[in-house]
Amino acid sequence: MNRLTQTAFMFARDLAQGRAILHVIMVAKQEKKDNQTTDIKISFTGSVNEENVRAFINEIKNLTEKFPNGTALTVYISSPGGNVDIAVELFHFLKLLDCTIRTVNISCVNSAAIIIFAAGTERISLPCSSFYVHSITKNLNGNFTTNDLLREAREMAANTDKVATILADVSNKNKSYWKRLMQKGCLLTSQKAKELGLVNDISEFK
């Protein structure tokens, strides 16, 4: 069993036991002649909401300050999704880091979590992992005017365009393709995600 597979089993165990969504897996240092490089491995396993994402961003900030020579950040992801705006914020945060970003789907990357996965320069999935894309939804409670509903509809359309743009940028399919897929609601296997260009590599069990 390779290290990536062992990591996936560890996360499955932690989720079953209800443990915290944030883990610093490993900080690996390597000496390269005159300088030292650091590879940081961390997990995001939980809903994409403000509390979880803020904690995640703060932890990465702490790690990058502690290890300024970091050359790579690996993010292991298993998430049911959540808030699109918060996911986009994390996407941009990861993109702005001055190191290689590697995202790994260790179980399921659904809904808004796909935006976080897309931030990876290297995007990896385990063979049995999956991705789920669907239409933007919003829960509304209370009384609303026509203008209120129209405003919400415009916001949902804008978020749909935002997600489709991000996925088109990292894949070999255009925005229209991803919008159609979102409208239908579609579960993607690792192999299908690789065919679409969303995944760069599938890590086989060894």
In which residue ranges do the predicted regions lie?
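Terminal-region recognition feature
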Residues: 1-206
